[in-house]
Amino acid sequence: MYFAYGEKELSYLRGKDKRLCNAIDRIGRIERAVDPDLFSSVVHHIIGQQISTKAQATVWQRMQESLGAVNAATLLAAGPERLQSFGMTFRKAEYIAEFAAKVQSGAFDPEAIARMTDAEAISALSALRGIGVWTAEMILLFCLQRPDIFSYDDLAIQRGLRMLYHHRKIDREHFEKYRRRFSPYGSVASLYLWAVAGGALSELKDPRPMKKTKKESRRSAARGADNGIDSNL
């Protein structure tokens, strides 16, 4: 299953911005896989924080092969020590076990998240240990398929904006200008800015000075073009 969008969203974005229009036409349709199961999506995102996509897939595969079904009951039965043995940090294992306990006890209802507004869902998800605002936003996009997710905390989106619009820096004011321009289809704009940041338009370079903070360097190394900032780690 892929993130659902069509000509309506693309036509809207083309009409709003010439540079994004050119990027859309040159890159073509982008297919990004989604996971419609919120429970597994939360677990998958906790596993994937600050590691490569390949490492994330390896840990997830080990978990599935060992536990069979990945659900609250099997995760609680496994416990943090066994979860850690699949290749994640003990802290992540604790976060996952705690999340499973909340779901099993009814303290957290995954189905209720789907009925919430974006702001409500982000607040509820980021209240979980191990889930910050950026991760919550990615869950809304790649699980719930919310149409207007455009994350200021996503370093690759900021990089894509710098490259496409030749900014040396994207501050909050710049970002909000683009967020308003692309709304209500910020999620589709995000897909194309991630592609730009990943080198889909090879002639575009990042005009930002090369020096990075230590935090940004760790994020970039771990997540490639899909990196973000999450303070709730």
Where are these predicted regions, by residue range?
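Short acidic alpha-helix initiation/capping motifs at coil-to-helix transition points
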Residues: 1-3, 36-39, 73-75, 114-117, ...
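A general alpha-helix detector
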Residues: 41-46, 78-82, 120-124, 138, ...
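Alpha-helical ds-nucleic-acid-binding substructure associated with the helix-hairpin-helix region
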Residues: 19-23, 51-52, 56-129, 181-183
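A positional/architectural concept
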Residues: 8, 14-68
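Short amphipathic alpha-helical interaction patches enriched in hydrophobic/aromatic residues
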Residues: 46, 79, 83, 107, ...
